Each structure stands twice: as C-alpha cells, then as structure tokens.
Amino acid sequence: MSDNTKTNSRNKSVKRTKKVKKKKKFGFFKKLFTILFCLFILLSVAASGVIFAIVKTSPNLDINGTILNLDQPSQLYDDNNNPMDTVVTNQRRYVVSIKDMPKNLSNAFVSIEDERFYKHSGIDTKRILGAFYNDIKSKIHKQNSIQGASTITQQLIKNRMFLNDSLENRISFKRKIQEAYLSIKLEQSLSKSQILEAYMNTIFLGVQANGVEAASRQYFNKSAKDLNLIECAFIAGLAQSPSAYYPFSQNVAKNPNIYLDRTKLVLYKMRQNNYIDFSTYQNAINDLNNNKLAFSQQKISNKYTYEWFSIPVVNQVKQDLKSQYHYTDEEIDSLLRDGGLKIYTTMNTSMESNVQNILDNNSTLKSYSYADKNGIIQPEAAATLFDYHTGEIKAIVGGRGQQPPSSYNRADSSNYLRSVGSSIKPLTVYAPAIDTKLATEDTIVNDSPLSSDVAEKYGSNGVPYNPHNDDGGYSGPVNLKTALTKSINLVAIKLEDKLGLSTGAAYAQKFGLTLNNDDKSSIAALSLGEIRGSNTTTMAAAYGVFGNNGLYSEPRLYRKVVDKTGKVLLENNYSTRKVISPQSAYIMYDLLKGPVSAGGTGSYARFGDMPVAGKTGTASDSKNLWFCGLTPYYSAAVWVGNDQPTKLSLGSNDVAEIWGEIMKMANVNLTVKDIDAPGGVTKIGDSYYIDGTSPSNLSGDDSSSSTASKPQTPTTNTQNNTNNNVANPNSNNTTNSNTSNSTETPAQNTQQPTPTPTPSTNNTPGNTNTNTNTNNNTNTNTNTNNNNTNNSSSGNNNPPNNNTTNTNK
C-alpha cells in the first residue's frame, strides 16, 4: 500500500472519530439541556404552586372597611354637638378629599414615588423585578439594602393591610407577592384618584403626622390646600424616610441640605414628568436657594383643650365599653385612638370656659395667690356645675391657671379627695333626721357640751370626745333651722348620735358619697365632715337631690357614643334613684336657704333675685373650704385649698362668693322662679312640716314623753342615747305640761334652759318644758387633739380621732 493510500486511510479514520465525538458531545448537551429544561419546568411549576398558595392565603381585600375607611382619633362633641376635643394619641390624621389638595402635591408624590402610576395596573413590572432581584442579593449577602420600588398602590396596600408585618420583617417575599396580587385587585375596584387620595391620607410623614393634612399642619402650621410648590415638594420628599429629612432634628437643622437636596430632587422629577415647566422649576429652585422654605413648627401637645372634662369622659367611655362589650384594654385604646368614634358629651362649652375664668380671676383668690415650687398657682380651686334635672354635668374645672397635661383633676378625681367639713351635715344629719321623722325644722336641740356618757361613747383611748363650735361658745336651745344657718357643730353631733351612725352612713351612701369603714364608725366624720374625702362632682350631684324631689340623678358625662359607621355603641340615658321623700327634699331646700340668708355662713352666695340654697364647709383646721348648693335650675360645688394642705387665710364665705359668681353665670337669662312645694307638706308660720308631723308631737328632750311614732330609718341599727340632749319622741322619763317636749334640758346642769314658747296659731313648737334634770351635762374635758384632721390628698387615710376639738362651719 502506498504512503498516500495510508495517509488517506488515516485521515478518514480521524474524521470518523471526530464525527463520533461530535455526536457524543452533542448528545451530552442535548441531555443536559433536556434535564435543565425539565428542571426549569419543574421549578416553574413549583414556583407557580408556591405563588398560587401564597396568593390563595392572602387576606381579604376589604375596600370599604380597610382601604377607604381611614383611622382617625375619636372626636368629642359638646352639648350642642359642636366639636370640642380630639382624643389625645401619638398620631395625627385629618382626612381630606383629593379635591382639597393642591395639584402640585399629588403630582409631587407621583413623580418621586411612582412616576408610571397612571400607566400600570397596580404593579410596575420593571421596578418590581428590579426590587425582587435586589432583595435576593440582600438576603444572600446578609445585607439590609432595600430597594424601594413599590408602586403607590402597593404602598397603600402595605400601609393598610401589612403595616405591622412590614415593620417587623422588612424583607418578606410572601408579603410582596400578596401585596402585588392585592394591588392588582384594588386597581380593578378603585379609580386612580381614589387610590391616590387614600394613599395621601395614610402615608406616614414624620413624628405624629399621618397623611398630608397632618404633615402640613405639623411642618407649616397650615392646611394642605394652602401649600405652595416647594412646600408640596418637601412633604412628598419625606415619604422615603421621614426621620432622615425631619427639619427640626438637631442633625438636620445643622445641615439643611439634607432635606433641601431631597426637595430639589422632587422638583426635578416633576419637571422631568412634565408636571411643571422649566420656568416654574427654576423659580422653585431659586426659592429654595433663597431660604424661602419657611417652617412653622406646630407645638406637639398631648393635652386636651378641655382637659378637666375630656379626660373623665374618655375614662368613663373606656369603662362602659369594657363593661358592655368585654373589650380588652388594648382593644379599647385602639378603638379610641383609631376608631373615629364620636363621643357626644354633656359639657356646655360656654359654662366650662366661664367657670375656669371665674376660678382663675376671682379677686379674693388672686389676692392670696402664689406659685408653689412646681410653678402651680396656690391656693387651688375646683368646681362642678350639675343639671340635676337631667343628670348632665355641664362643667368640670379641676384647677386654676396653667396646668401641665394630666394634672390632678381636683374636681373629679378619686385620687384627690378632701374632707368636706360642715357641707356634709345636710346629707348625713339634717336630711336623715327630717326623712325619718326624727325631727322637724323647729325641733329644739340644746347647743351645749356633750353629756359625759355621750362624750365617753365616742372617746378614744380613754379620752372623752370633746367637740367645740367654731366660735368656742354655745347658744343653748335652738331649733334646726337656726342650727343649720349658723352651722352649729354640737347640734349636728347630737342629732347624729340620735340617728345612729349606721343610719347617717346609709344616707351618705345614698347621696353618692364614698365612705370607708373608719368614716362609717366616726361621729366626727358623719356629723362634721371629717371623712376621708370627696370632690366637687360628688357633692354637686348630692345637693341636686334637694331640688329634684328627693331623687338622685346619676351624673352623666356623655349622652352617647357612635362609631364611624353611625352605629350607636353606648347610650347613656338619664337615670335616678330615690334618696329621700319629695317632702323631705323640699324641707331641706327650705332649711338650706338659712345659711345663705343675712347672718348665715354663706350669705355671699346670693345673687340677684334667683332663689339659692346651700351650705358652707370648713374642714381640717381651715385647710379645705367648701360651698355646695343649688338653684331651681342647677346644683354646684366649689372647693378651695392648697395642694399641700396648709391653713388658708380665706373663709368659707369667700368660697360662697365664688359659688355665687358661677351660679350667676349659669342662671343668666333664666326665668326667676322657686321650687314648688310637693303635696304632703304643710307650712306653719315660716316653717314647713311633713303632713302628720307638727311641733307638738315631734319636739321634746331626752327625758320627755311623746306620742310621736318611732323614727323610720333606712337601716335597722339606730342608736338612742338618753343623754344626747336632742328631742327624743320615744323617751318617757320627764314631767311636762304637754305630751311632747320641744325644749331640751342639759343633763346635770344647774342652768335652766330657756323654754320653748307656746305656739300661737301653730307657728312655733308648742311645748314648754319644766324638766329640771340635774344630770351634769357640762363636760370639762378640754382635749384639743387634732388627730381627727384628715388630709387625704397627702396620703393620710388614718381614721378620724373622735376626741378632736372640731371647729367646722
């Protein structure tokens, strides 16, 4: 074989080998491609399955309930249905229509946040794929670099449906898939204008601002409709990172280019998208360079406009929501903060403002005013104005002058209680005595020291109880009308002893007072007001009973609460309960005209021709001064004292004067009238009596015989002490010219008491007492221990010491 032939043969063999190798190589790649293609199909199917599963588990798209129904703080309205306050929260949102927003504002947001907003159908494919790729890299490299590529629609979905999840887990493929799916659905249901409006009302723009209206007020102290171009651009620029561009932070204030450059970028994008022309753009840039972006920082306050009233209202609504719907505290807070509730209160805005003005500017209070170490004006004062016909509280003022947020509400708080002094006497002594028919207006009680057995009964640690009157003297036999007019302590104590402490305590609680066990067992607490404490709201409601036929009107701070759909959640209807009979209430109203008459302890309470009735109270060695009373229209209570209890230089009549100023304001333009006497009441002379009672059968002393029926008390525990120096219709150990004695004779006293005159035409008690009981009623104990003084506001809740020398008025 020739060489050429061999060579050709080898070449052919090589070619065949190469061809075989090529076939094998092609077969390998073919198999690889097939495998990869199959894997791609499998992965695609799997991915589709995963995506389908994620989409399937997406939350329901509640457009009206979630997307368009924007969170707003609850609003409070006054008694004329005018807005008066907004529930204080850490967020502010004011929902406005896109029609009331500048076109530049919406264009600025679209330009910087989603320039293809009007072209896409919920998602911007180009941007979302880029963001998806960037997020994968961040996951792999454990970086925290997030590309903000969501459309405005997606941002709205996130803010309304995934906000908490987005804050806790910023990179979440599941959430992004669901956001994209729900965004497409939302675009199919709402117009672009509706979506943009919802977005601009929800976007967080720094500190308390949620939405453009809140941001406009926060940064420029104006409404969004009044924003100029550069202000619109600034607000739109905040959306990316509100804290980074916050102009009032220390760092940004030192380097304003941080927010200026961002604002310029927004303007550039607006120009690029043809929302503004070049000339407008250039003028805006020049304005920025010339410092024409002028901020007017709105003071951020957590204080209510009418804090004294609004806080009690909100607290009451919380309690009632919890009671009626069994909401948790967190659910209630969320509902009040974001639920847009409408709370219709009972507050009269004019009355509230006027009461505050009176307490702030009363000339007597101002003459004694000073600022304490915390800058709080002293002495403090509080007042409550109450419509006892409806149960509506019209005004609550818990302090004078400027107060920090959430200050002590001295008018309504259960944590700021003060002893009420003699203003308790009508509630626990005189009204029970009249209502149980133990006494009448003209029942005679001897104003004299306690008998030894009574003093010992209420003594402490072996020391007899030795109370005094304010002036240190005694008036001898006086009727109830005189005793109440002059606020005679000894008469109140003797009546309370005859009633029994349990009876007095039972009536106190019926009048709405809160007593602890020490109060219930203390003669000083129940007859002289040295209780743990009360406030003006409680006392105003209690005194309303005397003008309301004996009915206690439950105090109401609000009428109803309505949710944002118009559904009534709470309805606070007027309700009453019986405390005393209508006849007893009217007689007490008549008796309470005494203290405000000439010579009474509260004569300064009178104003004009409107009838008034009330009682002063001086407690804790003149550390607490009160006046409580009523007109035919309203009842009210006023307290004056120092936050750190110290003796005041004012008197109870000064507080009566303040009360008179408040009532003059409240009753202005009202018809002058008096309360009508109910049936079952008879007038004899200047006094009123419940039918079936009269001076002749209800007056007497400890040792007199009487035909009167036994007192009917609300409890079964009535103490009857035969040495208490009060008319006792059930005692029969005296000799008297009549079957019932109106004159009380002191036991063991050599001085003969002045006899009660015999009535002429039934106008005075008709019994002349000839009893010369020689029991020694003069108590020589002069213990002046003042442990009975109760300063509840300073945390002293010790029981009153019954051997105190009391000088309450």
UniProtKB/Swiss-Prot annotation:
Q: What is its main location?
A: membrane
Q: Which residues lie on this side of the membrane: Cytoplasmic?
A: 1-34
One Gene Ontology BP term is: proteolysis
Q: Which GO terms describe its cellular component?
A: outer membrane-bounded periplasmic space; plasma membrane
Region Disordered, as annotated, extends over 694-809
Q: Where are the transmembrane segments?
A: 35-55
Q: Where is this region: Transpeptidase?
A: 381-664
Record-linked PANTHER family? BINDING PROTEIN TRANSPEPTIDASE, PUTATIVE-RELATED, PENICILLIN-BINDING PROTEIN 1B
Q: What is the protein name stated in its UniProt record?
A: Penicillin-binding protein 1A
Q: Which organism is it from?
A: Clostridium acetobutylicum (strain ATCC 824 / DSM 792 / JCM 1419 / IAM 19013 / LMG 5710 / NBRC 13948 / NRRL B-527 / VKM B-1787 / 2291 / W)
